Amino acid sequence: MLSSNPMTWKLSHMVVPGKNSTISPDYFTASQTSPLDMMKFPSPGSSKRYDNGGGIGLGIVAALEKSSIGINPVCHTGAGSKGFDLARYSKRFQFAAGIDLSDSEEYTCVTTRDGLTKVYYKEEEFEFGHNLLNGDQRWRKPIEIAEESPAKERRVLRDCPDFLTSCCLCKKKLQGKDIYMYKGDEGFCSKECRSLKIMEDSLKEQHKLTSVEVLTGEEIASPGIFLI
């Protein structure tokens, strides 16, 4: 006869002894005083929640900070509706110059253990700490835009509407003529103009090496100059 206890019925159906088992089937029936019967399982409504009324992203971080629980750095990147909801926390992100990130996917939000939050948007950085939660609006942008790399400068040059329209040395028009390329982004009307440009660059490089040799006292071989 099955026990009236639901836990006893579940355990009796979960464990089935083998055909050659030496253990009596009686041992597979839980008693009324089984430790599982004495355990108190929490109800779904009693678990502690950190959603702060349905919030996500930094809402969880704020709840953890209030409960004095240490956290590791948390990073949120804009990704549509599944990303960090800046519209919900618009009061905490009052950017200068009217920047609205609520609909943007080009930002990254990072929160560190000490409570400092940084928001990276394009080439700008905004950061704030705990004091800003109380109304302080001090923002700072420590990121400085670095100089453009040579590769980026060459890309900009290729995108220029005047690209390969005139010789880079004598400025003659190149339309309808053979173009002699140098470094992939400089066009010349003749081999002579291109050779002069190569010589000019070689002399500049030699001057740099000579300056280094004077400063360090080391002998550095000068590059050869080859005319094409």
Swiss-Prot record:
InterPro entries: FLZ12/13/14 (IPR044604), Zf-FLZ_dom (IPR007650). GO terms for molecular function: kinase binding; zinc ion binding. It comes from the Eukaryota. Induction: Down-regulated by glucose and sucrose but up-regulated by mannose. A zinc finger (FLZ-type) spans 162-205. Interacts with KIN10 and KIN11 via its FLZ-type zinc finger domain. Interacts with KINB1 and KINB2 via its N-terminal part. Forms homodimer and heterodimer with FLZ2 and FLZ10 in vitro. PANTHER family: FCS-LIKE ZINC FINGER 12-RELATED, OS02G0174800 PROTEIN. This is FCS-Like Zinc finger 12. It comes from Arabidopsis thaliana (Mouse-ear cress).
